[in-house]
Regions:
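A short, proline-enriched helix->beta-strand linker immediately N-terminal to the Walker B motif
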Residues: 148-152
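Conserved H-loop
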Residues: 183-189
Length: 209
């Protein structure tokens, strides 16, 4: 199963219960703002500890409260593309990509760097500073860095946020190719209904509380 997640999270006074069970290559997690979608992604990546539950991705148990399993974030091998991208502003694009490569586990099956650069059409951006990139370019670089880390799975948090129609279309085409060409489960959070309908083979709704 791509994603087998049943967790309870305590965020301040709010209690979030999430269940994601999907065999699909790309699963969408949707819901209103404040429902806790990003918190669920954080829990899957190992950045937030659930109060209870179990997290398994691609057949590997990452967290199980009853079995006392809680893998460290680096052992979970999540390719996490945050909503704000989080590129290193003091490193050129090429160095940001190299950082992703250094994070790859020695035993991980990695997609060749040049293949990723060609796929995401960022060869002309390698000498640029992150602050000079457009929103669409920034997202493409962030996805490339995540893929270079040899991820077990990808977490994409609002990748279409603030993109115009043309850049959103370009990014959609790239995510489609990643979904179809690579054996990497993808969990996508998006408020863009058209993109969810286009990309996701299964949609899970999180209402929060």
């Amino acid at each position: 199963m791509s994603f087998d997640v049943t967790v309870t999270l305590q965020i301040g006074e709010r209690r979030i219960c999430a269940e994601i069970r999907s065999d699909e290559k790309l699963t969408a997690l949707v819901g209103p703002s404040g429902a806790g979608k990003t918190s669920v992604l954080d829990a899957i990546a190992g950045l937030r500890r659930p109060e209870s539950g179990r997290i398994a991705v691609a057949g590997e148990t990452l967290f199980d409260i009853t079995e006392n399993i809680d893998l460290a974030p680096n052992r979970r091998r999540a390719g996490y593309v945050f909503q704000d991208a989080r590129l290193f502003p003091h490193k050129r694009v090429d160095a940001n990509l190299s950082y992703g490569k250094r994070q790859a586990d020695s035993g991980a099956s990695c997609i060749p760097r040049e293949e990723i650069i060609d796929l995401l059409a960022i060869g002309n951006l390698l000498r640029r500073w992150p602050t000079t990139l457009s929103g669409g370019e920034t997202r493409r670089v962030a996805i490339a860095r995540a893929l270079l880390s040899g991820p077990r799975f990808l977490l994409l948090d609002e990748p279409f946020s603030s993109l115009d129609v043309e850049r959103a279309e370009t990014l959609s085409l790239l995510i489609e190719r990643i979904r179809d060409e690579f054996a990497i489960p993808i969990l996508l959070v998006s408020h863009t209904a058209a993109e969810v309908d286009r990309l996701a083979r299964k949609t899970v709704r999180l209402d929060g509380g």
